């Protein structure tokens, strides 16, 4: 019984997020867990050649510039 209880406690500790961390999209499908001081998910376009644009997504401390920036403070909200 003690072994089962110890196992449950260990699993709980390993699965618990002891400090809230933000998760954002990085690129088109990948996600990234932000550092504790990064509180914003962002998405914007970087101008490229021939009228194309490159999508930039990730975590940040402030809303970046760029074309049509979108910034938010909730998990996976920069899609």
Curated annotation (Swiss-Prot):
InterPro entries: Snake_3FTx, Snake_toxin-like_sf. Disulfide bonds join 24-41, 34-59, 63-71. GO terms for cellular component: extracellular region. Its main location: secreted. It comes from the Eukaryota. Expressed by the venom gland. Residues 1-21 form the signal peptide. It is found in: Secreted. GO terms for molecular function: acetylcholine receptor inhibitor activity; ion channel regulator activity; toxin activity. SUPFAM superfamilies: Snake toxin-like. Keywords: Acetylcholine receptor inhibiting toxin, Disulfide bond, Ion channel impairing toxin, Neurotoxin, Postsynaptic neurotoxin, Secreted, Signal, Toxin. Belongs to the three-finger toxin family. Short-chain subfamily. Type III alpha-neurotoxin sub-subfamily. Binds with high affinity to muscle nicotinic acetylcholine receptor (nAChR) and hinders acetylcholine binding to the receptor, thereby impairing neuromuscular transmission. Causes muscle paralysis, spasms and increased respiration. This is Short neurotoxin 4.
